[in-house]
């Protein structure tokens, strides 16, 4: 849903604002952990804490964008990996009964990769005027996460 879309874009934007190796290592860490979590959570019942974890991930990554926080690359990878567990489990428990797990995971990995890339590209093409827009986007993402958390 919208929560996953915003999270994937946000991770890409944040990684892109850090530049260098962070722009590909941080999204890659997210993708790998999300895929593993998705594979291992298939057939599990949905747990309400998963949706709360996704909402918190939006709040925190949105704040990282707003405040233009640049962490060491490994620390950034760890942060997004924790969030990726929630997103992966959410995808895994939603596996349709008739779907092939391999194709299903491949689909959400491809979609996530494209959304991360869009975020990285948007961040890489920023200028002084788009800095404000980038921070407003981060604020909207964080606010959406907060609203989702309150709704849970």
Predicted segments — roles?
Residues 2-152:
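Membrane metalloprotein/metal-transporter helix-bundle signature
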């Amino acid at each position: 849903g919208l929560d996953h879309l915003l999270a994937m874009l946000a991770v890409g934007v944040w990684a892109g604002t850090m530049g260098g190796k962070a722009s590909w290592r941080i999204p890659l860490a997210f993708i790998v952990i999300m895929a593993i979590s998705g594979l291992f959570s298939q057939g599990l019942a949905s747990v309400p804490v998963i949706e709360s974890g996704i909402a918190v991930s939006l709040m925190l990554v949105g704040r990282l964008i707003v405040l233009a926080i640049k962490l060491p690359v490994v620390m950034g990878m760890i942060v997004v990996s924790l969030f990726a567990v929630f997103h992966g489990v959410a995808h895994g428990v939603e596996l349709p009964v008739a779907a092939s797990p391999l194709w299903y995971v491949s689909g959400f990995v491809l979609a996530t990769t494209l959304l991360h890339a869009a975020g990285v590209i948007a961040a890489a093409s920023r200028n002084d005027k788009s800095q404000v827009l980038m921070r407003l986007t981060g604020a909207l993402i964080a606010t959406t996460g907060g609203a989702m958390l309150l709704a849970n």
